[in-house]
A protein has these predicted regions:
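Phosphate-binding glycine-rich loops and adjacent basic patches that engage nucleotide phosphates
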Residues: 11-21, 39-48, 98-102, 121, ...
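Conserved S-adenosyl-L-methionine
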Residues: 68-175, 180-182, 187-189
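A short, mixed-charge helix-start or loop-turn motif at secondary-structure junctions
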Residues: 64, 119-120, 199
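Non-catalytic, mostly N-terminal accessory regions of nucleic-acid modification and defense proteins
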Residues: 1-89, 149-152, 157-160
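Mobile active-site "lid"/loop adjacent to the S-adenosyl-L-methionine
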Residues: 179-212
Length: 212
């Protein structure tokens, strides 16, 4: 448990994010995990091996969850396609529905592959209503060596709030919008400067339905 606190002490963006109890795991399992990761064969693989391992288990986790809020993690192949089309190079990148942070990871990798340093060239901002998903995002960014500002909770509900006050200030906005979200209150959204083209269909309850 102290190990997690020591990690948080070294990374401001992970403060309050990491789990602080491992009572669900036996000492034998934890010892075996340490033995596996403390293996020279892993070092020999090179590259961002820890980040790739994290992504592997994150994808496994994503396949086993579903939510009435329409929350799901965008497949890596789709994220990669979006990034390759937009080709981010430098500046401010916002994902207003960032989930586990896939857009940031692939954008960072794209920038690094071009010979630049992603943390120097890019500034990452994210909004994620579900706090647990925002924690996954911050951990995902950390194991890939990226920094960013992620806001979560009601203030980060992108249907109603520009949590970072970035209207007109972003170089890139990437997102896989939460199309399944229903009952968005039109009155709380229609005054947003981020919606210059107006609102989609509003029903008799003054709500916007999902995108299906």
């Amino acid at each position: 448990n102290n190990a997690m606190q020591l990690i948080e002490d070294q990374s401001e963006q992970l403060t309050g994010v990491l789990p602080n109890s491992y009572t669900d795991f036996s000492d034998e399992i934890l010892s075996e995990l340490l033995r596996i990761f403390n293996n020279s064969a892993i070092d020999e693989v090179g590259g961002d091996i820890v980040g790739r391992i994290y992504e592997y288990f994150l994808n496994k986790f994503a396949k086993n969850i579903a939510s009435d809020d329409g929350v799901f993690f965008t497949p890596k192949s789709l994220v990669k396609m979006i990034v390759n089309i937009i080709e981010p190079k430098s500046g401010v990148l916002l994902d207003p529905a960032c989930g586990s942070g896939g857009m940031f990871i692939q954008s960072g990798d794209f920038v690094n592959q071009s010979g630049m340093n992603a943390n120097s060239a890019m500034t990452f901002y994210g909004q994620e209503k579900v706090e647990y998903n925002a924690q996954l995002c911050l951990m995902n960014m950390a194991v890939h060596g990226l920094t960013g500002v992620i806001k979560s909770g009601d203030e980060a509900n992108t249907f109603y709030h520009d949590a970072h006050n970035l209207d007109g200030s972003c170089d890139y906005v990437m997102a896989n919008p939460p199309f399944n979200v229903d009952k968005v209150k039109a009155e709380s959204s229609e005054s947003a400067k981020r919606l210059p083209f107006g609102m989609p269909g509003v029903n008799k309850n003054k709500e916007v339905g999902n995108g299906n």
